[in-house]
């Protein structure tokens, strides 16, 4: 096991494009760290820099107390699991897992012991003589993880390993990866664009956007106290509702919040009112119901603000302007076109500065 520390790490490509813009964070010994963000945020580039597959323009990467900037990937004592499995199609499962150890000159009895132990842990012992084409997607991913395990690395690196699997298998493999990492107690850095995957796997969440880190913390910390409007809207499904306060009637309802420019409310923190009165210190919002999604035990109600107030989104085009989402119990079913009032208490309100870059507590 080993800790991983990044100090002011930067990556600039020829032509001047800066993909990574001075990133600092540390992953503790045995910790499961997830890098999450939208496509193009730099998370995979950063992982490849840790692996040694991308050069570093500036800064330092430290693995286990050793700066590895100029050290070859094979000598960094890491193992990487890729999105496309990267298995040799002409080799058996056994030989795929043993190949790297043979190249390192390890003795046959030691190779055999490591391969069979990894196969036992991953429950793929009956598959050792099969070729990759004879395996399902989930089985191939287990083989790819087995190839990483036999190296007994200090750090596991995962580059969106579940993105090629169907939804049901993704959930099953997500659980398997977390159980495996805890069992081996090995430091892991995992890249994904799926915020649900990130929330369920991580000890530490690193939310990235545009080559910078927006927030670092445990999944619950990031969900409950997002540092910026980007984090508020990216972490959570459905995303947080964000509303401009400048010149808005909502500002008059707020107790405190001086300097706030944006109000955020999670969909589950809004409740339908029957008498139209907001809780003390909270807010009440009038909506016209535009759509209702029924998903069994709960429903998602989509509405537009009746008073014309503006909703904002750090991801233009992803949500209609002015849309508010409310999560309600499944048995509640407002009629389309109906006008309703929803409310949230003061302790469930999130306030941000006008630019959305700073949380105001």
From Swiss-Prot:
Cellular compartments annotated? Cell inner membrane
Which GO BP terms, alphabetically?
A: carbohydrate transport; glycerophosphodiester transmembrane transport
Any single GO molecular-function term of the entry would be:
ATP hydrolysis activity
What SUPFAM superfamilies does this protein's entry cite? MOP-like (SSF50331), P-loop containing nucleoside triphosphate hydrolases (SSF52540)
Alphabetical GO CC annotations of the entry are: ATP-binding cassette (ABC) transporter complex, substrate-binding subunit-containing
Which membrane topology describes this protein? Peripheral membrane protein
Q: Which domain of life is it from?
A: Bacteria
The record ties this protein, via InterPro entries, to: AAA+_ATPase, ABC_transporter-like_ATP-bd, ABC_transporter-like_CS, ABC_transpr_MalK-like, ABC_transpr_MalK/UgpC-like, Mo/tungstate-bd_C_term_dom, P-loop_NTPase
**EC assignment:** 7.6.2.10
Ordered alphabetically, the record's keywords are: ATP-binding, Cell inner membrane, Cell membrane, Membrane, Nucleotide-binding, Sugar transport, Translocase, Transport
Q: Where is the ABC transporter domain?
A: 4-235
Instruction: Report the main location listed first in the record.
Output: membrane
Q: Which reaction does it catalyse?
A: sn-glycerol 3-phosphate(out) + ATP + H2O = sn-glycerol 3-phosphate(in) + ADP + phosphate + H(+)
UniProt-annotated binding residues for ATP: 37-44
Q: What class of enzyme is it?
A: translocase
User: Subunit details for this protein?
Assistant: The complex is composed of two ATP-binding proteins (UgpC), two transmembrane proteins (UgpA and UgpE) and a solute-binding protein (UgpB).
Family, per entry: Belongs to the ABC transporter superfamily. sn-glycerol-3-phosphate importer (TC 3.A.1.1.3) family.
NCBIfam families attached here?
PRK11650.1 (NF008653)
User: What function is annotated for this protein?
Assistant: Part of the ABC transporter complex UgpBAEC involved in sn-glycerol-3-phosphate (G3P) import. Responsible for energy coupling to the transport system.
Q: What is this protein called?
A: sn-glycerol-3-phosphate import ATP-binding protein UgpC
Organism of origin = Rhodopseudomonas palustris (strain BisA53)
Query: In the record, what lineage is assigned to the organism producing the protein?
Result: Bacteria, Pseudomonadati, Pseudomonadota, Alphaproteobacteria, Hyphomicrobiales
């Amino acid at each position: 096991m080993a800790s991983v520390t990044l100090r002011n790490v930067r990556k600039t490509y020829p032509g001047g494009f800066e993909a990574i813009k001075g990133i600092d964070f540390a992953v503790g010994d045995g910790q499961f760290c997830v890098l999450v963000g939208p496509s193009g945020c730099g998370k995979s580039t950063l992982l490849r820099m840790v692996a040694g597959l991308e050069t570093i323009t500036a800064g330092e990467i430290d693995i286990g107390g050793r700066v590895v900037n100029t050290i070859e990937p094979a000598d960094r004592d890491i193992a990487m699991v890729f999105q496309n499995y990267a298995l040799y199609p002409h080799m058996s499962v056994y030989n795929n897992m043993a190949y790297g150890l043979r190249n390192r000159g390890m003795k046959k009895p030691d190779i055999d012991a490591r391969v069979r132990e990894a196969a036992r842990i991953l429950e793929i012992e009956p598959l050792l003589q099969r070729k990759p084409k004879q395996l399902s997607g989930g089985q191939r991913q287990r083989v790819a993880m087995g190839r990483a395990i036999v190296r007994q690395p200090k750090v596991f690196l995962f580059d969106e390993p579940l993105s090629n699997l169907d939804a049901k298998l993704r959930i099953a493999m997500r659980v398997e990866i977390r159980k495996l990492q805890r069992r081996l107690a090995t430091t892991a850095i995992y890249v994904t664009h799926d915020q649900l995957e990130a929330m369920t796997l991580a000890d530490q969440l690193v939310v990235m956007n545009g080559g910078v880190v927006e927030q670092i913390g445990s999944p619950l910390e990031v969900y409950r106290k997002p540092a910026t409007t980007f984090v508020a809207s990216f972490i959570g499904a459905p995303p947080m509702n964000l509303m401009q306060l400048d010149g808005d009637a909502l500002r008059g309802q707020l107790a405190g919040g001086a300097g706030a420019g944006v109000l955020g409310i999670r969909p589950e923190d809004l409740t339908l009112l029957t008498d139209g009165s907001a809780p003390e210190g909270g807010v009440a919002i009038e909506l016209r119901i535009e759509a209702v999604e029924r998903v069994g035990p709960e429903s998602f109600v989509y509405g537009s603000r009746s008073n014309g107030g503006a909703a904002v989104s750090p991801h233009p085009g992803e949500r209609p302007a002015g849309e508010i989402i409310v999560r309600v119990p499944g048995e509640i079913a407002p009629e389309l076109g109906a006008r309703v009032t929803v409310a949230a208490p003061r302790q469930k309100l999130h306030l941000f500065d006008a630019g959305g870059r700073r949380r105001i507590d």
